[in-house]
Amino acid sequence: GTGAIVEYFGEGATSMSCTGKGTSCNMGAEIGATTSTFGYDDSMRRYLTATGRADVVEAADKVADYLTADAEVYANPEQYFDELIEINLTELEPYINGPFTPDRGTPVSKMKEEAAKNDWPIKVEWGLIGSCTNSSYEDMSRAVSIVNQAVELGITPKAEFGINPGSEQIRYTIERDGIIAAFEKMGTKVFTNACGPCIGQWDREGADKGEKNTIVHSFNRNFSKRADGNPNTHAFVTSPEMVAALAISGRLDFNPITDKLLNDNGEEVMFKPPFGDELPTKGFEVKDPGFQAPAANGSSVQVIVSPDSSRLQLLEPFQPWDGQNITGAKLLIKAFGKCTTDHISMAGPWLRFRGHLDNISNNMLIGAENAFNNKTNSVKNQLTGEYAEVPTVQRAYKAANIPSIVVGDQNYGEGSSREHAAMEPRHLGVKAVLVKSFA
């Protein structure tokens, strides 16, 4: 998918909900896609209407023919697309992706074999649903259908369970419709409507011990140390309903399609297929969406930031290119293997500095593995001959007015669209990033 525009079409694509399409497009970043797209269809009309945007539907309908490919393209797709991949959704079984990367997929029927072969921890410690992906009304309603079955069947969940609603509108609506209460009946922790555990914004007890463990979640990314700072946390990505089933069973190798569970009375029980509503039957509702409209005329608005602030810093324009070739550059780091935005600019505790470019630049490339010594955050300062942290060495080059370059591998920059991953190297004086391909 690197460098490609991926278009989804066909009966299967049409059958998906609008928010389901949104999840597929969101996660297109993990295959390196430049853009992921679905043609305009009824699912989008339904969603836009339900969310109070009938005016957008009216405008889109006027140009609907231009918001999807021509009929002859879909009739003979081989003639028009560079590559054609056919997926039969009726034959597609659930996948569990990971650990440490979302592009390593294992069919649920093969997980027992793969886990044993790779020595992945079988016991599931946490199941997590939500954040920006897989957190729609449909996602929550399908997941809670599994939770309700567990309650009815008398099964006590074997793992801890948490949810992050996708927005205040989703949180308010699922609370009104009893979905949150159903989750809480099973002991689920309801986190705030934010990134949360997806980027380490939670207080996970015991993570500092560095013990080998497994968590499953429906977030879009699961890179090493991302969820809790523990490099031994094996994080797996799967659908919300699969997260619910795995958390209830407490086992990574549980297949809800074929496997039985013992309830609290020692009886063998099985889950029925999940189900849920694409959109709330009573409509969406929210009291305070958190939106503050900007001033009608902002020309007189002044932004005042304390020069002593460690969290906020006004941006200064970058120096423009002087038109000359880069000469005398030092190699800052040759990153080995995967170098995602998490490797380039970690989240978690660093997010407090996201409004202060200089301070957050102290995390630049600290997660990248140096190809010359196979260590993270350890590169050779070519001015002193000593090894030091990546940002420290780069600041030394900048102070000496010496340009530097970064070398990477395939799909450099895969992951969250954090602007810091692009801004930090430039802020600290890196002149070029040389890789086989960019995400």
Regions found by a protein language model. Name each.
Residues 1-58, 155, 189, 201-289:
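Mobile "lid/hinge" segments at catalytic clefts and subdomain interfaces of large enzymes
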Residues 3, 82-84, 124, 158, ...:
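Active-site lining segments that contact anionic ligands and/or coordinate catalytic metals
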Residues 123-125, 232, 330, 408:
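A generic hydrophobic-helix recognition signal that picks specific residues
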Residues 268-318:
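Acidic, Ser/Thr-rich low-complexity intrinsically disordered segments
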Residues 144-164, 168-231, 249, 317-319, ...:
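Feature captures the catalytic cores and cofactor-binding loops of soluble hydro-lyases/lyases
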Residues 7-13, 29-158, 162-205, 298-325, ...:
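Accessory "access/gating" subregions that flank catalytic or transport cores
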Residues 17, 54, 88, 107-110, ...:
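General structural signal for secondary-structure boundaries
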Residues 2, 18-22, 38, 42, ...:
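Conserved structured core elements
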